[in-house]
Amino acid sequence: MDMIQLLHKLPRKLTVAFSGGVDSVAIMDFLGNNHELTAAFFHHGTDVSDHAYDFVHFYCRDRGIPLKVGYMRDQKPKDESWEEHWRNQRYKFLEEFEYVVTGHHLNDCIETYIWSAMHGNPIVIPDTRKNVHRPFLLNPKQTFIDWCNNKNLSWREDWTNVDDKYMRNYIRKNVVEQRLS
């Protein structure tokens, strides 16, 4: 589906899962002229989330975009990793909204498939999960970077995504990004 068709397919009012990263900044800008947006930011209760919140807060304030913030509420079960717990909490927060769009892209799909296959359970990111929609799954991350660079938009990088000691980050940097660049 081309981007013009996508604009007309989405509802007029929608919520963007907004982290302040390049993908979510690009889709906020892309959708902003044709849709009534609300930004949904999830605070994980960490210093990294504090810095991300500052960026997201000022971005939304400067553009007049309503911002809704969710916070960690539940204790992490012993059988859950932190990453899994945070993801579950984020999706629980996003259930509060009628129609949510995320910035998941092709790189995310490939990374998730490789990582999950290495753990014996290969999965593909679905384009829809309840009220959460991922219309950009066929677009490589570079599309979002190019969009932001062409529009002189700034975004924030999450430093926790670059530490190679985590297998998912290693896959992202050394397999996916090298193959798609």
Give, region by region, the residue ranges found by the protein language model.
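An accessory alpha-helical subdomain
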Residues: E177-S181
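Core alpha/beta nucleotide-donor-binding catalytic domains of modification enzymes
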Residues: M1-D146, N150-K173
